[in-house]
C-alpha cells in the first residue's frame, strides 16, 4: 500500500514552459549582477567555492565562474552549485512579483485529497530545495508548502540514478514498496522502479512510446486503486 508520494516538478506539477521560458531566462539575465553584488554573502560564496571544486579550478575568479555558469546553462547541466545560485536569483523574482510559480489546475486538488487520505507528500527535483520551496510558496494558488513533508534535490543523487531513490527512501523512513514517484521522464522512473518504488508517468504533451510505466494525463487519473496497490 502506498504511504507516501514523491513528485517531480518540471513537466509534472508545473508546465515545462514556465521553467524554460520564465525561470531560466530570468536567471540568465540576472545571475551575473547578482553574483558580483553578493559574492561576499556566505551562501553565494559557498556556492562559488562548490563550483570551483566541481570544475577543479580552485583559483578561478568570479568572472571566470560566471562564464562557467553560462556554459552550464547552455548545456542544461544539473550542477548543484548552479541550481543553488539560480534559486537565489529566482527568490528575488518571486519576492518582487516578476512571476509566480505555475501549477497545473489538477495538481492542488489532488495534493489536498491525498494529504487528507493520510499520504505523506514530498518533492524531488533537480532544482535546489530552496527553489522548490519558492515555486510552491509563491505559486499561482498561493503558498502550498504546508502540503509537503519534505523536499529533495540532487544532494540525494542524480534523478536517473538508482541510489538517489534509495537515499530518499532512507530519508523518508519507509520501504520502497510503499513509495510512489511521479515524473514525466521515463528514465527517472526507470531508476525509481529499479530501487523498488511504484511509478506513474505524467504525460502532459506528446506520448512517450518508449516508456514501460503506467501513464496518466493528469493527477486526477491517479486513482485509489493504484494508491491501494
Swiss-Prot record:
Functional summary from the UniProt entry: Bifunctional enzyme that catalyzes the enolization of 2,3-diketo-5-methylthiopentyl-1-phosphate (DK-MTP-1-P) into the intermediate 2-hydroxy-3-keto-5-methylthiopentenyl-1-phosphate (HK-MTPenyl-1-P), which is then dephosphorylated to form the acireductone 1,2-dihydroxy-3-keto-5-methylthiopentene (DHK-MTPene).
Pathway: Amino-acid biosynthesis; L-methionine biosynthesis via salvage pathway; L-methionine from S-methyl-5-thio-alpha-D-ribose 1-phosphate: step 3/6; Amino-acid biosynthesis; L-methionine biosynthesis via salvage pathway; L-methionine from S-methyl-5-thio-alpha-D-ribose 1-phosphate: step 4/6
One BP term from GO: L-methionine salvage from methylthioadenosine
Subunit structure: Monomer.
The encoding gene: mtnC
InterPro entries cross-referenced by the UniProt entry: Enolase-ppase_E1, HAD-like_sf, HAD-SF_hydro_IA, HAD_sf
PANTHER family: ENOLASE-PHOSPHATASE E1
Name used for this protein in its record: Enolase-phosphatase E1
Annotated family: Belongs to the HAD-like hydrolase superfamily. MasA/MtnC family.
Keywords: Amino-acid biosynthesis, Hydrolase, Magnesium, Metal-binding, Methionine biosynthesis
SUPFAM superfamilies: HAD-like
GO MF: 2,3-diketo-5-methylthiopentyl-1-phosphate enolase activity; 2-hydroxy-3-keto-5-methylthiopentenyl-1-phosphate phosphatase activity; acireductone synthase activity; magnesium ion binding
Catalytic activity: 5-methylsulfanyl-2,3-dioxopentyl phosphate + H2O = 1,2-dihydroxy-5-(methylsulfanyl)pent-1-en-3-one + phosphate
EC number: 3.1.3.77
Class in the EC hierarchy, top level: hydrolase
Cofactor binding mode and count: Binds 1 Mg(2+) ion per subunit.
Native source species: Erwinia tasmaniensis (strain DSM 17950 / CFBP 7177 / CIP 109463 / NCPPB 4357 / Et1/99)
Transmembrane segments: none
Cofactor(s) for this UniProt protein: Mg(2+)
Amino acid at each position: 500500500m502506498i504511504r507516501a508520494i514523491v513528485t517531480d516538478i518540471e513537466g509534472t506539477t508545473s508546465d515545462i514552459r514556465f521553467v524554460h521560458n520564465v525561470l531560466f531566462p530570468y536567471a540568465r539575465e540576472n545571475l551575473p549582477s547578482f553574483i558580483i553584488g553578493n559574492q561576499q554573502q556566505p551562501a553565494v560564496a559557498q556556492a562559488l567555492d562548490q563550483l570551483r571544486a566541481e570544475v577543479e579550478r580552485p583559483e578561478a575568479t568570479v568572472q571566470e565562474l560566471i562564464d562557467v555558469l553560462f556554459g552550464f546553462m547552455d548545456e542544461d547541466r544539473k550542477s548543484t552549485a548552479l541550481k543553488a545560485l539560480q534559486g537565489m536569483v529566482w527568490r528575488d523574482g518571486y519576492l518582487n512579483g516578476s512571476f509566480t510559480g505555475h501549477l497545473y489546475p489538477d495538481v492542488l486538488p489532488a495534493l489536498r485529497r491525498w494529504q487528507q487520505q493520510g499520504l505523506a507528500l514530498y518533492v524531488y527535483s533537480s532544482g535546489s530545495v530552496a527553489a522548490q520551496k519558492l515555486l510552491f510558496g509563491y505559486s499561482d494558488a498561493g503558498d502550498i508548502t504546508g502540503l509537503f513533508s519534505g523536499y529533495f534535490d540532487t544532494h540525494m543523487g542524480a534523478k536517473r540514478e538508482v541510489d538517489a531513490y534509495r537515499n530518499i527512501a532512507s530519508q523518508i523512513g519507509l520501504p520502497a514498496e510503499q513509495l510512489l514517484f511521479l515524473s514525466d521522464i521515463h528514465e527517472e522512473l526507470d531508476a525509481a522502479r529499479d530501487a523498488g518504488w511504484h511509478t506513474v508517468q505524467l504525460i502532459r504533451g506528446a506520448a512517450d512510446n518508449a516508456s514501460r510505466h503506467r501513464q496518466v494525463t493528469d493527477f486526477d487519473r491517479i486513482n485509489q486503486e493504484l494508491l491501494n496497490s
